[in-house]
Amino acid sequence: MGNKLTNISTNLKSSWLTAKSGLNRTGQSLAKAGQSLKTGAKKIILYIPKDYQYDTEKGNGLQDLVKAAQELGIEVQKEEGNDIAKAQTSLGTIQNVLGLTERGIVLSAPQLDKLLQKTKVGQAIGSAENLTKGFSNAKTVLSGIQSILGSVLAGMDLDEALQKNSNELTLAKAGLELTNSLIENIANSVKTLDAFGDQINQLGSKLQNVKGLSSLGDKLKGLSGFDKTSLGLDVVSGLLSGATAALVLADKNASTSRKVGAGFELANQVVGNITKAVSSYILAQRVAAGLSSTGPVAALIASTVSLAISPLAFAGIADKFNHAKSLESYAERFKKLGYDGDNLLAEYQRGTGTIDASVTAINTALAAIAGGVSAAAAGSVVASPIALLVSGITGVISTILQYSKQAMFEHVANKIHNKIVEWEKNNPGKNYFENGYDARYLANLQDNMKFLLNLNKELQAERVIAITQQQWDNNIGDLAGISRLGEKVLSGKAYVDAFEEGQHLKADKLVQLDSAKGIIDVSNTGEAKTQHILFRTPLLTPGTEKRERVQTGKYEYITKLHINRVDSWKITDGAASSTFDLTNVVQRIGIELDNAGNVTKTKETKIIAKLGEGDDNVFVGSGTTEIDGGEGYDRVHYSRGNYGALTIDATKETEQGSYTVNRFVESGKALHEVTSTHTALVGNREEKIEYRHSNNQHHAGYYTKDTLKAVEEIIGTSHNDIFKGSKFNDAFNGGDGVDTIDGNDGNDRLFGGKGDDIIDGGNGDDFIDGGKGNDLLHGGKGDDIFVHRQGDGNDSITESEGNDKLSFSDSNLKDLTFEKVNHHLVITNTKQEKVTIQNWFREAEFAKTIQNYVATRDDKIEEIIGQNGERITSKQVDELIEKGNGKIAQSELTKVVDNYQLLKYSRDASNSLDKLISSASAFTSSNDSRNVLASPTSMLDPSLSSIQFARAA
């Protein structure tokens, strides 16, 4: 409670001093007011009832008042009760601090004494001047009253007003009443902020006593609904009536000019017929003063009053209450999930909106009054006292109200703070804002449950593990800033769920997800043989957060974020065949950004994965990755994301399945973790909170290196990749792009994918599939198999040694066209795509033209096979080409296909081919996680005696 009082008193200090400073600058006439009050009937008198007793030994408040009054030049008089009664009769203000009598302005000593004896007020006023003694408190109060009266009553001839009971006296009484109200409001603000609506109501009632302002008084009196029980939504809706204008103001896409127009309409409704009422009042004063009230003068007054109304102020109020209404609706769902923070935020918006609406309505009306009076008084010496009086009153009210808003706002924020602290007290060990993230996650889970329950079928996995990163939430950030609890808020929270057979399981016993230590353990697979680990949203880097709130200015604070980072994620798999898509795991950290938001300095988080048993698939992300495939047939995919071309050189590797993958990621946009700043405002107080989140940021090019162990197959990127195989059996899939693939030694399986690729099988019995694009294929030494399909484009094959085969896996042999073009054999399918076997006829032609020529090369493919297993040998091709003068006739091909002996030979050869390629993998390069990523299967259907080569989708 002490801290609360200190905070409020500090705000009061600022408000009081600023008000005094502002009043001292209101003009020369106001500056002279204090001196004029010390002479004649304008003097201030401290009245002490004759029978009022006080203990001089205890040094109570009244003694301090007397001493302070004497020092300030204020007359001190003890009077009989009947003299005090005169003051009460004059204005009925003996219960107030101030009264007005024939002798001057009366300060009621008992009332001031009571104020100073209130502990809270004494503390507040004392702390405002850094004083603790009663004398100083008394002096502060009296000097403040002098300052206010100096402005309110500047330029007034009180002697004449008291004698004639003129209109000016009515205004003087109203000014004095307003001053009384303001003094009470300031003196009791420590305990009456909740009742601010009532204060406004009282002020409205007092304004009704001023001739011509009854309409304004009625409107302000209507603000009494702004108390802590109703908090203003209904009242403000009534006050800010006018559906059309309200809709315009609520429209975020409405233009400024349209909002201004709507604001004028709305403002006129707020103050009723304020222009008319104030104009009539001012014209009446001019008549009383014997001044002109002609049409042009009236028009000048009315236009000046209208211009004094600020429409945009009311636009802001409408927006604030619309926001509160939206928050209330939004909060309903999360309240059911155990989080009431959005409702607290709505409560804050309603509370501060109430204050804003009240102050803005009053200031708007007062500005209209002051503007109209100034217009009426233009060029008139007689009317100057009225203008000065009204300007003084409106200036005092506006200044004090405006600079009291911060204390009022902080009071509303303190209530929010206390509710959060109380919740955490009643829920030991829990964090209120973390509870907010929990509720957000549960709502997200509910919204997506149907989709998630269908993932087992979509991903064709017995178990699906879904990891969700709940990232920074602006509402939670606002609440943390408003409540001054930014040190407790988190940047987000990660959650894990499991799904089996369309059922949602508790994942805490199946999966270990520790974001603080960087651990993801999915090895407890139970009876599940296949599982898919899906990162639904970008997962932030591992580590722990700590925040520190520091003050950077009078009202400016920043909550700095300090991160104790862990340099890697450690992933552990078990016996199941698992698929990991790591492209949504954030590995790049933007340490420094330029003014445009481009990353200029980065840090990397490594991923270390131990896959265990099973046939696993890993889709690599943007940073360094170490993978130990363990047992089973494991594939590493680089086909998702845009993380640079691969360069693999395994020529010196000493273990099968070991590769070093170098990547260069060119400049562009990629997923980064960056630190941003959230800003929340509480009146003048600005709270900045640092938080981290993921975002696609522009970056410079960078290198990264992956280490693979016990990996059976690598799928490349959409860039131009380079693969150099080992001396062992390699399986490379180039993916998209113009790839260069060299199998080196071993029996390799090489697939080009899309693009015009260059593939060299090297030594060994290689399986080569160029894929789509115009590819250059070289078998090298060994018994190689080439594959071509319709839609693959125009391929060129160079072959030298071995018993080689070419399969047109989706074309009938008799539908192909064979012809000799120069030294080459060109085979054309029904799509007019050509496969050119380079130098097929070169050796034979050399033998014909060069005497005693001995062939040194075998550039032919020994068998060419159709989709149903039908085939033609190189010998048959030569014979039929020669017979057909460079082209095989269609009838001759038909005979080959129909020949029984060839078919029998085809079946025998198919059995041999089946043994050769039965271990070949089904190549995959799909970006669709729903594809079946199967284990290796035979690619021969013996029942059809046909070769069926699986390909990338």
Swiss-Prot record:
Pfam families: HemolysinCabind (PF00353), RTX (PF02382), RTX_C (PF08339). This is Leukotoxin. Acylated by LktC. The toxin only becomes active when modified. SUPFAM superfamilies: beta-Roll. It is found in: Secreted; Host cell membrane. The transmembrane domains are believed to be involved in pore formation in target cells. Hemolysin-type calcium-binding repeats lie at residues 715-732, 733-750, 751-768, 769-786, 789-806. Belongs to the RTX prokaryotic toxin (TC 1.C.11) family. The chain crosses the membrane at residues 230-250, 297-317, 359-379, 381-401. Pasteurella leukotoxins are exotoxins that attack host leukocytes and especially polymorphonuclear cells, by causing cell rupture. The leukotoxin binds to the host LFA-1 integrin and induces a signaling cascade leading to many biological effects, including tyrosine phosphorylation of the CD18 tail, elevation of the intracellular Ca(2+) and lysis of the host cell. This leukotoxin is a major contributor to the pathogenesis of lung injury in ovine pneumonic pasteurellosis. It also has weak hemolytic activity. GO terms for cellular component: extracellular region; host cell plasma membrane; membrane. Keywords: Calcium, Cytolysis, Hemolysis, Host cell membrane, Host membrane, Lipoprotein, Membrane, Repeat, Secreted, Toxin, Transmembrane, Transmembrane helix, Virulence. It comes from the Bacteria. GO terms for molecular function: calcium ion binding; channel activity; toxin activity. The lktCABD operon has a complex mosaic structure that has been derived by extensive inter- and intraspecies horizontal DNA transfer and intragenic recombination events. One of its GO terms (biological process) is killing of cells of another organism. It is a multi-pass membrane protein.
